[in-house]
Amino acid sequence: HIWYADDVMGKFIKAAEAYDPSTLFVVTGDHAERFNFSNDVSLWEKSGIPCFFYGAGIPTDLFAKDAAGSHLQIAPTLAELILPQGETYESLLPSLFDSRRAFNHRLYIENGQIGEEKDLKDKEFKAEIEAARTIAIWRIKNGNAIRSIE
């Protein structure tokens, strides 16, 4: 199924680029899947989910070589890429350009180190994770209550 997915994605990107050469593609997955039958696989290798940004004008070294983050950081990254310089935006988490800290449902990354959240010692980071989750859940449940002030 990996060959098929790669083939279909490649055909889609070629067709979209032919239609609009300025298209920006962000491709990621929703879970880690590795076909490695060794027990000597690191948590980083076992848990990593690929994400790439591709399009005209997007350099191959857009992110630091050791950049890591979460899906919640894709939207602010897009904002930084496409908004006019000096334009501001609000986000729960920083963009992938600031990838010192990230988390998912059970893991955290801090300064290039990955671990189980239950083992995280940094109380400030734990509080940030809990706050971001609380706000995200509230927005999912009550998002329609948010109104623009004009």
What is the role of each PLM region?
Residues 1-8, 14, 46-49, 61, ...:
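Catalytic-adjacent loop/helix segments of enzymes that bind and process anionic phosphate/sulfate esters
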Residues 50-53, 57-58:
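His/Asp/Glu-enriched, well-ordered alpha-helical/loop segment
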